[in-house]
A protein has these predicted regions:
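Conserved P-loop
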Residues: 1-60
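Short loop/turn segments at connectors of secondary-structure elements within structured domains
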Residues: 10-11, 69, 150
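Flexible glycine-/small-residue-rich
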Residues: 18, 47, 77, 148, ...
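Structured loop/turn residues at beta-strand edges in well-structured enzyme cores
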Residues: 38-41, 68, 138
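P-loop NTPase motor core
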Residues: 48-53, 58-135
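Phosphate-binding/switch region of NTP-binding enzymes
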Residues: 105-176
Length: 176
C-alpha cells in the first residue's frame, strides 16, 4: 500500500491486482490519511476469480499501461490461483504463468511492477522455495524474502544479498 500511495499522492494511477481478496480499505485509509477518497479514485483494483481470469486481467493491464497514465502495477499474490490450477492442469498452468511473467516483464520496462508471491518449504533439501519456481525467479529483477523468526528481517536476494531488520507499526515498516 505504501508503494501505491507514493504514486497516488502524485496524482498518478496505480493498478492493484488482489487475488487473495486481502486489500484492506481500513489499512489504506489509515496510511493515506484524510485524502484517502481522492487517492482511491486513481486506484484501479482488480479481483480475479481464478487463474484464467488472472491471466486475462494481466493481459488487460498490459493494454491499460500502453494507453498511459499508469505509474505502478501491484500483484498480490501471483501464485494464489496458480497453485490450485497446477493440481489439475500443470502443463497449461506453467504455460500461462510463463506468459503472465513475460507480460509483467514487458510492463516493467515502462513502469515499476511489484509482485508478491507464495513460498513453500522443500522437504528434500530443507530450503524455502518460490511457488512457480524458476519461471518466477528468472524473470524477477529483485527478490525479497520476509522472515518472521527468529527476528523480523528482510533478505534481499537479488540484485545483491543484503539483510535488514525491521518492526511493524501503524505507519508500516520501521527499519532498525
Amino acid at each position: 500500500i505504501h508503494a501505491a500511495l507514493h504514486f497516488l499522492k502524485e496524482r498518478k494511477k496505480v493498478i492493484y491486482i488482489d487475488t487473495e481478496k486481502g486489500f484492506s480499505l481500513e489499512r489504506f485509509q489509515q496510511l493515506a490519511g484524510e485524502h484517502y477518497r481522492a487517492y482511491l479514485q486513481s486506484l484501479i483494483l482488480f479481483l480475479p476469480r481464478n487463474f484464467k481470469h488472472q491471466h486475462e486481467t494481466i493481459q488487460q493491464v498490459s493494454s491499460l499501461v500502453t494507453q498511459g497514465n499508469i505509474a505502478l502495477v501491484i500483484i498480490d499474490t501471483l501464485s494464489y490461483y496458480y497453485r490450485r490450477f497446477m493440481k489439475n492442469r500443470p502443463d497449461l498452468g506453467n504455460t500461462m504463468l510463463i506468459r503472465q511473467m513475460n507480460i509483467l516483464e514487458q510492463i516493467s520496462k515502462k513502469i515499476p511492477v511489484i509482485v508478491s508471491n507464495q513460498v513453500y518449504s522443500s522437504v528434500s533439501d530443507n530450503t524455502v522455495k518460490i511457488v512457480g519456481g524458476i519461471i518466477v525467479e528468472k524473470r524477477s529483477d529483485c527478490l525479497i524474502e520476509l522472515v518472521k523468526e527468529p527476528r523480523r528481517k528482510i533478505i534481499v536476494k537479488r540484485p545483491e544479498q543484503r539483510e535488514l531488520l525491521f518492526t511493524m507499526n501503524d505507519s508500516g515498516f520501521c527499519f532498525l
